[in-house]
Structure formats: C-alpha cells, structure tokens
Amino acid sequence: MKTKALYYLILFLNFSLLFSFKCGHDKIKKPPKILNDSIIIDDDSTRKLDDSYHSISFFIDYTQMNYNAYGTSDYRNFIKDSINSTIKVFGELLKVKRSGKISISNPAGCSERITRYDSSIKTGVDYDIILIPIIDPTLEDGVDAAASACYLSSDNRPIMGYVLLNQNYSYKKTNAQQFLTMLLLHEITHVLVFSDDLFDYFQYSDVTTTQTINGISRTLIQTPKVLSVASQHFGCSSITGIELENQGGEGSAGSHWEARIMLGDYMISTDYPEIVISDISLALFEDSGWYQVNYYTGGLFRFGKGQGCKFLESTCVSSGESNFEWDFCDESYENKCTSNNLNRGFCYMRIYSSLPAYYQYFSDSRTGGWEPVDYCPVTMSYSSSSYYFSGNCINGEIDDTKIYNLSSFGFKISDSSICIQSSLINSNDNSLSYYGYERAMCHKITCNSSDKTISVDIGETVIECPTDGGYMEVDGYNGTIRCPPYDRVCTSKTYVGDSISAALNHIPNEDIDSSYKASSGSITMKFNRIIISIFILFFLYI
C-alpha cells in the first residue's frame, strides 16, 4: 500500500494542473445588428454575388490592438501569427457564398472597445468577414479570451466581430501558440455561428428545445444535421438533441456544448488537453444555412463514441463506479490515459463543501469530479509551468526520468504515439520491482486497416493488438498491456494529434470530404497549496 501511495505521490508532486481558461463570450455579447446595405456590388469587386461557394476569407484589422499597445510587441506579434494559423483552419473548414465588398458605416458601433479601425472598413473590403482583435487588460482572471459578432448581412450571416485577448496570457510556454490557436478557433466560432444570439437567425426556426434529463432542465440543439451526425457518433438512433452547457453562469452557459457529453470538443466552455473539432460542431455550421462545411476533422472526436443512448441519458457514475470506463474514471488520482488516448494524466476527484443531490455519485456526498462535466470524474492531463498539456504522447514534455527509467516500460513519445494503459516492466531491469500497478504509458502505434489490428511498439518489441482490444502479455516484460479497440483510435486517417495540427499539417487530398470540393486548400481549475499539503500529509501517514 505504501509503495502504491508513494508512486502516486511522486506523480502528483512532479506535475501540476494549470487549467486556467474560461470563455467570456456571454459576458460581452450583445444582439448583433442587421445591415441591409452592408454589401457593395461594383465593377471592382472580385466577389460579385452569385450562387457559388468559396473558402471563407477574413479581413483582420489590428489598428485598435496596435493603438492600445497593451502587452509587449512580442506578444502582439505572437497573436498575429496565431490568428494567421487560425484563419487558415477556417479556410479549410468553411465555404460561404460569394458576395461583394463589405462596407460598415459605423465600425465603432461594434463595441465600445473599438475607437480606432482601418478606414477601408467604411469604404469596403473584399472579404467575407471583418475581425478586430483587441488585447484587453480588463478581462477577469481565468478568462483568457472572449468574442462576439456585432453586424450581420442582409442574409443574417455574421460579417463583423471582435475578439478580446487577456493581456496576461502565458505566451512563452513551449507550445503556447498551439494552445492560443485552439483558443482562437473557439472564440472566432462564437463570432461565426455558436452563440444563442445567432441561433435566432438560423435557417431553422426551432434550433433549441428544452428537456428534463436526470432531473435537470436542459437546453438542447435539435437541428437536423447535428442530430444526424450525433446519432452516428454516439450510436443512438433516438437522439433528440445535444445539450448546451447549463453551468458556469454568465460567460459559459447557453453558448457552449455540455462538457459532460462533449468533453474534448473545442466548443465546451473550458480548456481540455484533447480539444478537437467534432463533426457535431461542424454540423452546427451547416445547419445555420450560411456555410458549406468540410467534415475531414470530425473523426478525431472520440468522447462517448458508440456508447449508445445511455451515455446521453444516464449519469457518468453509479454507486461509486464509472458507467463508461473509457470516458469517466472513479479512483482519485489514478494514473490514467485521457479519453482520446492522447495524453497521460490522472483521475480528477476532490471533496467539495456540498454538492446538489443530482451530482452525488459516491457514498460520500461531497465527493465529485470536475465541475464543468457535471462533477463527473475525468482524467486530466498533466501540465507544467513551461508547457501546456505536457502529458501529450505526441509532443509532451514530462520529466519522468527522476521517477524511473522510461525504457523499462517501453515508453516512447513520437508523432504516432498514443497513451495506453500498461503494467509492463522489463523483466531484466533489476532496479524495479513489479507490483502490477497499471500506468498510463506512451507507445508508438501503427493502424493496420487491412485486418483492423494495431501494431504497438514496446521498446524493441512490436506486438499486434486485436480488433476488439484487450489485455496482452509481452515477451521480456512482467505485467500486461491493455490494447485499445481498433475503432477507438484508428477510425480517422489522421488518427493521432488533435484537429488543429491535423488541419494545419495533415490535409492529404483523400482526407478532404468530396462533397466539400475544397479549393487549394469556466471554471478556473488550479490546485490550492493547502490541498497539496493535505495530500502529502495523507500519504505520510498511510
């Protein structure tokens, strides 16, 4: 018992969880204004009105950001680079019908924060949407960004919006640009489509519905394409909608997916180490009636995949045990893989002062998991002071060497590695004793589509995992490795990495949805030092 306790204690003390993002969209949004005369059709316009579609284009106006001069020049340049990466992703994902130039007679009417702007916005810019980024020193702690649309065209599509970025964003972490790109994808989606103020302008009149689920009144999106792709993803033919977030108060509720069933999608209200762009979010773009959508990133979303209607309708944990072991956990601080098998982490549970009856899953009514997931316990990736999501198996930066020799476990971080549960220890390593404890380990894999098996590298040894997964022994090692099912990790051609890196770096022609015909192509969570002290004292007395 002491050995196991010491193992978890060392893990806990070596890695800190620094999730601090909370979206502030609903705190700044105002009902957008329709401008019937905002589109200019003239002989100089390269986008004369017709019925064809083209990749969405952005006019980014940095005038206000440069005028305010908040943050360092390095930070402002960092933001510009991240925005360029972000709009490239949207250019691959979305097409809009051609229009003329966009002319906004009163750009400052977009927000009281906008006092300076490019004069061409008033005369007309030959783009599909105008976006004004602003570094804002007034955003509250934990809110890294917020965004909103402000003007709509005569066909109700957003044509101007702004995004606020926290002056104190930690942009010097190793993979900070990837994280900010993820953040900008989220915020700009609020400008383009995902806002309860925009739902009123969708092509369908009944975008949302209200139902009681597990004793709680919920608001759900029920548009046709969302229902279709969600039914396929979850394996539930009778699905009636996808829930919107009901927690977090102003800023989160109503304009985000419910994290309990959409954890890992980029449109939940808080950051998570496996943010991807799901088919379900892409379907919302299509259902608006404003966009033609490329669905190539959606296969990367795996939370709740194939779990059936029960996943949508029942609780995550019953009588202290997870109802869905791939997606929820039930043992506090257990070293585990996150649900997409991309990150190493631990089962997040804690003691609250009190919990509502419908969020009580354990014998101790105060025990719960992560608040944004309806207090369900989920696996959270490790982070460090210098690296976002350092537990990632593709490009993580965890210094485990202080704990043990990684080669003894066949561990490998690479572009094609995933996280796999394993108790394997090299039988020739006399420095380690075998206790049978299962750990989250990174292993390089190859998906074999011909027979739906997975080749897993364990040190110099390669094993073949069967289609349905399961426990396997490995020559030269004590213990077993728990192979994941083929369909869980190999269903997408870009089966490793998140949708951001896939969108930026991995877009072979065969991965593009043929129907798209693309052209060239909050809750703030920080560990309190008191909790750490209690944790240490607990293990000292085991």
Residue ranges of model-derived segments:
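Extracellular zinc-dependent metalloprotease catalytic-domain scaffold
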Residues: 19-183, 191-516
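Residue-level signal for pocket-adjacent positions within structured domains
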Residues: 262, 535-537
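C-terminal GPI-anchoring signal of eukaryotic secretory precursors
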Residues: 511-530
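N-terminal signal peptide
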Residues: 12-26, 538-542
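Compositionally biased non-globular segments, especially hydrophobic aliphatic-rich helices
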Residues: 8, 47-49, 521
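Positively charged n-region of N-terminal signal peptides that target proteins for export
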Residues: 1-5, 541-542
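Extended, alpha-helix-rich binding/interface surfaces that flank or overlap catalytic cores
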Residues: 188
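Sec-dependent signal peptide recognition
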Residues: 3-11, 528-533
